[in-house]
């Protein structure tokens, strides 16, 4: 039991419903000052809704929500929420603003109509210096659009500090970061919690990272707290998985990889650049490893997203280079983006139109037929997608369920090649295993898979061979299944295992 007077925020018996769907069913949760607190739970458990209630973007239906200041005094909910900030997986920054403008923006929203560049620069430098003095000295006049994702996170955290935040909620902050960037982020969080008394809620599905950074953890399952404020070191990975209700799903991960069976086509694909090529047989899963520069260039060429002259894709009936993603899709080359929020999910269209998007692109149809509606319902059931209606918007679904929708697009059209960009990014362990099995099943139909992941353990588990890129973005070799290892991948990519 924690001392309530030391909690920066605490909720008791919190409830929240959306229509007939009860999302939070009596959640208890508290965060102490200076603490890094891991919030765990499967997709759809209620984590995002809890965050929305704490930050005030959703109103609670029942229960108690208490904020305290640094002295332990109880604040009104309105005052308390001014001390809370969220850094989402998809950053909320305007690319055309400078770093200084982005950090100082909340101050000018509060009343001043005149932008004072000198004041903005001073405020931004003071906040950013708390994180990284060297970065603060060089970044203020840079455009946000020119920053790396890690640098953008630093700007968001600095903006929160500049606004007086005492609690920062980080939602899957490492999903798009390299190992080195992740370690730098962890260093920043440790510095701020120890030296400045900041409190952090860290939402992640990565067990290793949770153990590296979090002091305590709480687990939500089906809208209820099943583990509250337990020291992370006291819980094994298996115990965490069981509390999340995903022990059975994890066991599936150790099943043998089914042998590929080519039934769609017996034509192989050859992916080539000057002096190098790799042949991808139907039903084969080719992993792609390395820093983003190489994989991103390859993927752009595979799906016709750029006039990339470096790579060619050879297959009977296909051009050497697709002119556009639409042409690629029409000829049977699908793509699932790693940026589901901005480039994947069609937020203004219902679930059924999201699932049928690839069919629309390849066949030109506009409206769902009754037969397509039935097929879509069957597909949702097979994928274990829980949705009240096919006509609901996808924003009502968890991140993992949205990821299933993106994959479902290519289950209802014949595909000879499917290119996957970080397909399990930001999903829980159970959903990850379901995606593994889904891709294995697609491979057995003869679909060739190209799978880019920054998680080497994932590539080792799922792939038949791995194409590696070095830190300069150059292809450095192909590793066959029987030679795959963490050390081999680290050697060819130049990145630590």
Swiss-Prot record:
Binding residues annotated for ATP, in chain numbering: 41-48
One GO cellular component term noted in the UniProt record for this chain: plasma membrane
SUPFAM superfamilies: P-loop containing nucleoside triphosphate hydrolases
CDD domains cross-referenced by the UniProt entry: ABC_Carb_Monos_I (cd03216), ABC_Carb_Monos_II (cd03215)
Places the protein is found: Cell membrane
Primary subcellular site in the record, as a coarse category: membrane
Keyword list, A-Z: ATP-binding, Cell membrane, Membrane, Nucleotide-binding, Plasmid, Repeat, Sugar transport, Transport
Domain ABC transporter residue range list: 9-247, 256-496
GO molecular function, one term: ATP hydrolysis activity
Membrane topology reported for the UniProt record: Peripheral membrane protein
Glycoprotein listed as a keyword: no
PROSITE patterns, sorted: ABC_TRANSPORTER_2 (PS50893)
Protein role: Probably part of the binding-protein-dependent transport system y4mIJK. This system probably transports a sugar. Probably responsible for energy coupling to the transport system.
Family, as annotated: Belongs to the ABC transporter superfamily. Ribose importer (TC 3.A.1.2.1) family.
Name of this chain's protein: Uncharacterized ABC transporter ATP-binding protein y4mK
Native species: Sinorhizobium fredii (strain NBRC 101917 / NGR234)
